[in-house]
C-alpha cells in the first residue's frame, strides 16, 4: 500500500460549514475501512490535509473526489503520492 497526501484548500467557507456533517461521516467511514492514515484541519482556516492509504494514485483520487467537501465544491483537491519516512 502507498500513502497519498490530499490537500483540501478552502474554496467556500459557507459550503464547507453546510457539508461538514457529511464530510465527518465520510472520514469516519474511510477510517473504519482502513483508507485513512491521518487527517486534520489547518489551524489558520485555510483548509485541511488527509493522508489516504491506497494501491494507486487513481484509487486515492477516486476516494478523495467522493469526499462531500470536494464533490460539493467547498474545497479544492491537490493530491500527491507521499514517500513517508518515520523519524525516530
Where are these regions (language model features)?
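Conserved, structured core segments of small domains
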Residues: 1-88
Amino acid at each position: 500500500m502507498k500513502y497519498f497526501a490530499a490537500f483540501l484548500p478552502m474554496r467556500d467557507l459557507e459550503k464547507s460549514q453546510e457539508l461538514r456533517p457529511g464530510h465527518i461521516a465520510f472520514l469516519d467511514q474511510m477510517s473504519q475501512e482502513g483508507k485513512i492514515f491521518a487527517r486534520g484541519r489547518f489551524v489558520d482556516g485555510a483548509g485541511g490535509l488527509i493522508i489516504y492509504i491506497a494501491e494507486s494514485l487513481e484509487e486515492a483520487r477516486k476516494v478523495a473526489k467522493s469526499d462531500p467537501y470536494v464533490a460539493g465544491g467547498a474545497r479544492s483537491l491537490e493530491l500527491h503520492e507521499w514517500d513517508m519516512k518515520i523519524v525516530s
